[in-house]
UniProtKB/Swiss-Prot annotation:
GO molecular function terms attached to this record: ATP binding; calmodulin binding; carbohydrate binding; protein serine kinase activity; protein serine/threonine kinase activity; ubiquitin protein ligase binding
Residue span(s) of domain Bulb-type lectin: 24-150
Organism placement in taxonomy: Eukaryota, Viridiplantae, Streptophyta, Embryophyta, Tracheophyta
Binding site for ATP: L471, G472, Q473, G474, G475, F476, G477, P478, V479, K493
Reaction catalysed by this enzyme: L-seryl-[protein] + ATP = O-phospho-L-seryl-[protein] + ADP + H(+); L-threonyl-[protein] + ATP = O-phospho-L-threonyl-[protein] + ADP + H(+)
Protein name as annotated: G-type lectin S-receptor-like serine/threonine-protein kinase At4g27290
GO BP annotation list: recognition of pollen
Domain PAN, residue spans: 342-424
Length: 783
């Protein structure tokens, strides 16, 4: 009887082993995975096997997405110990370790068991690839407790379900490390890692140097990542207990693929897979602009990307070295204008809003303390420099105290946080008086909206609108240079009586531009209305408009490549402000070379908001039956169907980029080899790997990095794609221009054939074409 039972158990064990061996997602103990073999997760989402990245001949054991056409590796076992032939074999040993052997049967890589696992509990260990992309070692029959898992030892990829952070009990710290290059998965220069000192936060480092800091979690998001918002793709979660602190996310729809990757160039970016394009689409970046550079403005300095210069001292502080500050070196930061009165108990706090909170490594926190008690605790400690709520939800709760200097602060237009900065009581009284005077002036300005100048004043300033003062002719009338009685030089936009800009457009331009403040937008100073006369008074830009340089055979040489690329970046920042960062969401609708002015330092200033349209906070598109704009710059969907969106401006920006690079107009472009316009010509050259041939010869000597110019051309082509959905948002454009993020291949541009512009498709549209090919046009669509 006993022998029968033993035989029965042996049969069951043998049968179970056979079933496991037949499973495509499992390896059993001592079973071998050879180069050329793979195991695939049960749902077919991920595959494990050997691969060679890019043009490399080295072999690695890795995990990649199974269902997509582009091999995307999410984890590499032997990243620093490559195989040099096809001899690699993988086994799971009886003690629960994964072992990778080379041709000499030497172990070149092995897994380490989880700190919490007990080898005594091992029984029939197996290795399995899950549909989450997690490669696990577990006991046969136990799918809950893992002996080891790849998600505990990530490489450059943050996958759904991974606990990205630190376990205080086991000491396990899960962090990202970049590849050395796109075809070399060995340990790269960049890491993104949780620092538990003070209030935990993530630090992106290049080797040992901090590049970017996320800031602490405030209950809704990291304070240094305002773009992290609830979305339909994934649901994120932050867990902070006595045992562990980590950030994780889960897919809202398992069929949607998304990943966060630390690229070899240090860019920490999220991508989503677009099936119809068969490519990864950029979705979000941790770093947005130069203000994200760690401690750019030094101690007690704050960075605002919409200001020029970007750095300024917090209220109550002054530059430590004024000369360096003026020269653009802000690294030494700021110091207190008035020393603290801590010993006398007369200090107070100034509330500063919409901030990225300072570095919290030297901070202290209490999750439950109320804000009033938080303030008292800070006042009792002379080294306490600021305080803030730990969690901003439900009106705020908890307490963070900072000790020592406040560093790495920046300002946002939205989703920033309140910080209470310690100042001497006398300093607070001074600031309150200044604030009261400023508020009074602002109220007066809001009541008046803009200063009104009478006709006589404007006429005298422009010498009676003399021909000698005329700067140029726009679509809505002439522009004159003027000098006010106070000596200030101005530009006067005088609307012609036959101008197509009616009262509506005039009011629109006043209301819009009066509310806009950005270093890359022209500043309006006042207006004049007298019977049929309507005029706008702007700050004067001595270098006039961009088109007077790039399209002029002689003056184009004054704009070398460094200046041109800065102009492109300036225009991009200005458009991003209009689309996302201003109090209003604005579509310009007439972005072109003649509407970009240049100041004395050749900084770009976007002008002419007569055609601009505002959208609601969540709107991104609208329709019109009155199409207005300029041929050569208007997007196809707008010119043909009257459909305009933020992507319409992106199209115009792309045209402008290609014009700046080439020194040629899109409209009227001629080439002996074809009948394409500039967009079509640039696209054709790009496809033939000859994009460099469109570069303006005037910048050849100053163009020391051809790859930068080719990248700008590439970005321009992405902006002018036919389908608006394919075009990037301006936030992505700014990021592409300021980083080395990977770029998708551009698709066919819109209106790339000059000869077939639109006449065959729009017979119902009555075109009203102005005599000047480069003036603003108006199309009345009767539909």
């Amino acid at each position: 009887m006993e022998a029968t039972n033993v035989l029965h158990l042996l049969i069951i064990s043998l049968f179970s082993t056979i079933l496991l061996a037949q499973a495509t997602d499992i390896l059993i103990a001592n079973q071998t995975l050879k180069d050329g073999d793979t195991i695939v997760s049960q749902g077919g989402s991920f595959e494990v096997g050997f691969f060679s990245p890019g043009g490399s001949r080295n072999r690695y054991l890795g995990i990649w997405y199974k269902k997509i056409s582009l091999q995307t590796v999410v984890w590499v076992a032997n990243r620093d110990s490559p195989l040099y032939d096809l001899s690699g074999t993988l086994k799971v040993s009886e003690n629960g370790s994964l072992c990778l052997f080379n041709d000499r049967n030497h172990i070149i890589w092995s897994s380490s068991s989880s700190p919490s696992s007990q080898k005594a509990s091992l029984r029939n260990p197996i290795v399995q690839i899950l549909d989450t992309g997690n490669l696990v070692v577990r006991n046969s029959g136990d799918d809950q407790d893992y002996i080891w898992q790849s998600l505990d030892y990530p490489g450059d990829m943050f996958l759904p379900g991974m606990k990205y952070g630190l376990n205080f009990v086991t000491g396990l710290n899960r962090f990202l490390t970049s590849w050395r290059a796109i075809d070399d998965p060995s340990t790269g220069n960049y890491t993104n890692k949780m620092d538990p000192n003070g209030v935990p936060q993530f630090f992106l480092k290049k080797n040992s140097v901090v590049v970017f800091r996320t800031g602490p979690w405030n209950g809704l998001r990291f304070t240094g990542m305002p773009n992290l918002k609830p979305n339909p793709i994934y649901r994120y979660e932050y867990v902070f207990t006595e045992e562990e602190v980590y950030y994780t996310y889960k897919l809202e729809n398992p069929s949607v693929l998304t990943r966060m990757q630390l690229n070899p160039n240090g860019a920490l970016q999220r991508y989503t897979w677009v099936d119809n394009l068969q490519s990864w689409n950029f979705y979000l970046s941790a770093m947005m602009d130069s203000c994200d550079q760690y401690t750019l403005c030094g101690s007690y300095g704050s960075c605002n990307i919409n200001e020029s210069p970007a750095c300024r001292c917090l209220k109550g502080f002054v530059a430590k070295t004024p000369q360096a500050w003026v020269a653009g070196d802000w690294s030494e930061g700021c110091v207190r204008r008035v020393k603290l009165d801590c010993g006398k108990g007369e200090d107070g706090f100034l509330k500063i809003s919409k901030l990225k909170l300072p570095d919290t490594r030297t901070s202290w926190y209490d999750k439950n303390m109320d804000l009033n008690e938080c303030k008292k605790v800070c006042l009792r400690n002379c080294t306490c420099s600021a305080y803030s709520p730990f969690d901003i939800r439900d009106g705020g709760k908890g307490c963070i105290l900072w000790f020592g200097d406040l560093i790495d602060i920046r300002e946002y237009n939205e989703n920033g946080q309140d910080l209470y900065v310690r100042l001497a009581s006398s300093e607070i009284e001074t600031l309150q008086r200044e604030s009261s005077r400023v508020s009074s002036r602002k109220q007066e300005e809001e009541d008046l909206e803009l200063p009104f100048l009478d006709l006589d004043t404007v006429s005298e300033a422009t010498s009676g609108f003399s021909a000698g003062n005329k700067l140029g002719q726009g679509g809505f009338g002439p522009v004159y240079k003027g000098t006010l009685a106070c000596g200030q030089e101005v530009a006067v936009k005088r609307l012609s009586r036959t101008s197509r800009q009616g009262v509506e457009e005039f009011k629109n331009e006043i209301k819009l531009i009066a509310k806009l403040q950005h270093r890359n937008l022209v500043k309006i100073l006042g207006y004049c209305v007298d019977e049929e006369e309507r005029m706008l008074i702007y700050e004067y830009q001595p270098n006039k408009s961009l088109d007077s340089f790039i399209f002029d055979k002689e003056r184009r040489r004054e704009l070398d490549w460094p200046k041109r690329v800065e102009i492109i970046k300036g225009i991009a920042r200005g458009m991003l402000y209009l689309h996302e960062d201003s109090r209003l969401r604005i579509i310009h609708r007439d972005l072109k070379a003649s509407n970009v002015l240049l100041d004395s330092d050749m900084n770009a200033k976007i002008s002419d908001f007569g055609l601009a349209r505002t959208l609601g906070g969540d709107e991104t598109e609208a329709n019109t039956t009155r199409v207005v704009g300029t041929y050569g710059y208007m997007s196809p969907e707008y010119q043909i169907d009257g459909y305009f969106s933020l992507k319409s401006d992106v199209f115009s920006f792309g045209v402008l980029v290609l014009e700046i690079v080439s020194g040629r107009r899109n409209r009227g472009f001629r080439n002996e080899e074809h009948k394409l316009n500039l967009l079509g010509h640039a696209w054709r050259q790009f496809l033939e790997d000859k994009a460099y041939e469109i570069i303006d010869e005037a910048v050849n000597e100053s163009c020391t990095d051809i790859s930068e110019v080719l990248r700008v051309i590439h970005i321009g082509l992405l902006c002018v794609q036919q389908d608006p959905k394919d075009r990037p948002n301006m936030s992505v454009v700014v990021l592409m221009l300021s980083s080395e993020m990977l770029l998708l291949d551009p698709r066919q541009p819109g209106f790339f054939n000059e000869r077939n512009l639109l006449f065959s498709d729009t017979v119902s549209i009555n075109l009203e074409i102005p005599s000047n090919n480069f003036q603003t046009m108006s199309v009345i669509d009767p539909r």
